[in-house]
């Protein structure tokens, strides 16, 4: 009976780890065709408004300028001009397809992640008892560690997350989250998050040391500051 009680929280922890991957894989396959049909039906009349987006418009203008340049430099026969027009038409259709695929990809990933969040939230609420057991195990494990090990672990974690060498790691992680949600890579937004998010974490961490650790374990705070210096 005791082994069963110990096994249940571990099984619950493993399910939390693998459940997002399974949900993402399942819903990606089931939602893709539905979202594609919905997008093609809905956007068939409104694409001319969306094509004003900067990236698509720049590519379209580039193709058009190449056509006009060729027409100005040489006098082509009508058959050749017709081929150029067909080429521009094909390129425009390709741009439209890429535009639609990007939007479908964004909607699909955002919907999948939203569904995954809702399911995991409900799963966490239903498994509240298992979470309490896991939390008690974690607290017992941390309590049995010496203050030196605790201070070293805190210092290592803070250096990894908010140290001077952490921006590249934050950039990779935020870029990965952006890609997972299907958003287009944006250097300005990512740079802004990288420059502000670690600062916010650093402030929260210092406040936590001041309010919590100073009250619970003053010796740990002394060791931490000694190692940090």
Curated annotation (Swiss-Prot):
It comes from the Eukaryota. GO terms for cellular component: chloroplast inner membrane. Pfam families: CemA. Keywords: Antiport, Chloroplast, Hydrogen ion transport, Ion transport, Membrane, Plastid, Plastid inner membrane, Potassium, Potassium transport, Transmembrane, Transmembrane helix, Transport. It is a multi-pass membrane protein. GO terms for molecular function: antiporter activity; proton transmembrane transporter activity. GO terms for biological process: potassium ion transport. It catalyses: K(+)(in) + H(+)(out) = K(+)(out) + H(+)(in). The keyword Membrane applies. InterPro entries: CemA. The keyword Chloroplast applies. The chain crosses the membrane at residues 7-27, 114-134, 154-174, 189-209. It is found in: Plastid, Chloroplast inner membrane. Contributes to K(+)/H(+) antiport activity by supporting proton efflux to control proton extrusion and homeostasis in chloroplasts in a light-dependent manner to modulate photosynthesis. Prevents excessive induction of non-photochemical quenching (NPQ) under continuous-light conditions. Indirectly promotes efficient inorganic carbon uptake into chloroplasts. HAMAP family: CemA_PxcA. Belongs to the CemA family. This is Potassium/proton antiporter CemA. It comes from Gossypium barbadense.
